Amino acid sequence: MKRRPAVAGSFYEDDSAQLRKRIEWAFHHPIGPGGIPSVGSTGSRSNPIFIVPHAGYIYSGPVAAHSYYYLAQEGKPDIVIILGPNHTGYGSQVSIWPGGDWETPLGSAQVNAQLVKELVSVSEVVDIDEKAHLYEHSIEVQLPFLQYFFDNLSILPVVILMQTPEIAEFVAEGIWRFIQRHSDKDIVVLASSDLNHYDPHDVTMTKDELVIRKIQDMDYKGLYKVVEEYDVTVCGYAPIMASLILAKKMHKKPYILKHATSGDTSGDKSSVVGYLATRFSD
């Protein structure tokens, strides 16, 4: 089953040459990492988990580039598991694409139906459901960054509608079991999320810092409490919580790579969205 791009031409360029230029712009942007990394050879991976934003590239691309800089340096993963929030409300509580190609202007990424069934079998909450993915952007916008560096990607896209600590625990445990079954594979997990939405820049930076402190403390329940109590409008807090739980199981620590807002890239700081790039390593 083919999944065609839903946000090409809006969140990112729908022309392949222009899209490549946009990605290069993100890496060279003053908010970005400052250059394009050399793709490393496959081998030992010290950064298996990342947090990445998912807005329009002109806004969040330079922040996202920080995570992809480290990912690319360690070579092409065998499998990329991408966790994103469900913005549309379609589909089940936790949904994975059934299998087939995901298309973007830079080519196709493969969703292996057998691996999908295996992840579902070791998880208690993940359902096979294409409806949740048809118009969702949180996973799609990660693919061109990956495809810029790697051909013939194998991905497992999972979107989460029910964003509670309990669901995050189930998702993380299922992924952990899957990783243990495939200990010979190089598997990377991406948690796709933006941070606070539509407050002024200074307010957003303050609210975001509450969340970032909980990420640094590896406190996923505390993160959930902050989001709820302080009205921090993080759209993908379940993917972030799952990444923290999984990182603990893998004995990895968070390293904040970049925190900025859409105001830093657009110049308009009256109403912004916060973005965070984080890697998890030894």
Swiss-Prot record:
Q: PANTHER family annotated for this entry?
A: PROTEIN MEMO1
Record family assignment? Belongs to the MEMO1 family.
Task: Report the NCBIfam families cross-referenced here.
Answer: AmmeMemoSam_B
Q: Which HAMAP family match?
A: MEMO1
Q: What is this protein called?
A: MEMO1 family protein Msed_2139
Q: Which organism is it from?
A: Metallosphaera sedula (strain ATCC 51363 / DSM 5348 / JCM 9185 / NBRC 15509 / TH2)
- Taxonomic placement: Archaea, Thermoproteota, Thermoprotei, Sulfolobales, Sulfolobaceae
